[in-house]
Amino acid sequence: MRLLYLNPNATEAMTESMALVARKAAPEVEIVAWTNHLGPTAIQGAEDGDAAVEGLLSLLPKAKDAAVNAIIIGCFDDTGLRRIRAAAHCPVIGIGHAAMSLAALHGSRFGIVTSLDISVPVIAANVDLYGYRDACVGVFASGL
């Protein structure tokens, strides 16, 4: 299996760090990791997320040529997930959606802690979109 980890932001160090973690977690899987060099340096709220989408979409032909089996959007707010899913040649999941799905599978309620207040509305909207409103006790910013 060949998975593509797509970092929506333009920070190469973040891409490398997440790829390292993914490779350790799943050594039997080939992890390809790319940085969205057309995106902002960080995804902090809806405006940054919106600014990242075109760059992510521009990477999809390359992803198809690279014969990846699935794409992971490597930002908890699942930047551009719906548009990328609609345009991709393969399954696409965001790490936020994956985390919420896993938490819900365990059958207990869960909460989400993010770093900045500006990220709360985007993540809270995703909780609703994915159908986890009743399972999620809230989305909170740590201020870190």
Which residues fall in each region the model found?
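N-terminal glycine-rich anion-binding loop in soluble enzyme alpha/beta folds
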Residues: M1-G55, S115-L144
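Glycine/small-residue-rich loop that forms an oxyanion/phosphate-binding "nest" at active or ligand-binding sites
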Residues: V53-S108, I112
